[in-house]
Amino acid sequence: MDYLSESLKLHYELRGKLEIQPRAGVSNKDELSLAYTPGVAAACLEIKDDVSKSYDLTRRWNTVAVVTDGTAVLGLGDIGPEAGMPVMEGKCVLFKAFGGVDAIPLCVRSKDVDDIVNTCLLYTSDAADDK
């Protein structure tokens, strides 16, 4: 099999290897009111009172970011963050398929280590935990 050409066809066909799937139903008014407003306010207020509950009340407990600045992508060298996205998506697929972990690709357009670290901290809401 010609993996390069077949993979390129797959990428054109799928237009990305990831998608978000809802875990909560929204097929009627009651389900929608539980998953979103007004019911969601209860979870928000619980987390407001105790931030650690975000791990119990959201998918945060099982979600990671796969981060790159695009400078060292699978031996391709410095190809940039946009060109690194297919590899990051592939890694996210592996996290889910083999570990059951939800992974989100985060391709940062900066080569400055402090920028990248700060972006990750801000994205994950852990910046306050480190102060």
Regions picked out by a protein language model, each given a short descriptive name:
Residues 2, 13, 22, 91-101, ...:
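Extended, charged alpha/beta regions that create polyanion-binding interfaces
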Residues 106-113:
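Short beta->alpha junction loops
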Residues 28, 68-78, 95-105:
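Gly-rich Lys/Arg/Thr-decorated short loops/hinges at beta-loop-alpha junctions or inter-strand turns
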Residues 55-60, 96-97, 122:
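Solvent-exposed alpha-helices and their adjacent loops that cap or buttress functional pockets
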Residues 15-56:
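An N-cap/entry alpha-helix motif that binds or orients negatively charged groups
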Residues 74-88:
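Glycine- and acidic-residue-enriched helix-capping/strand-helix junction motifs
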Residues 123-131:
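Single conserved hydrophobic/aromatic residue that forms the stacking wall/gate
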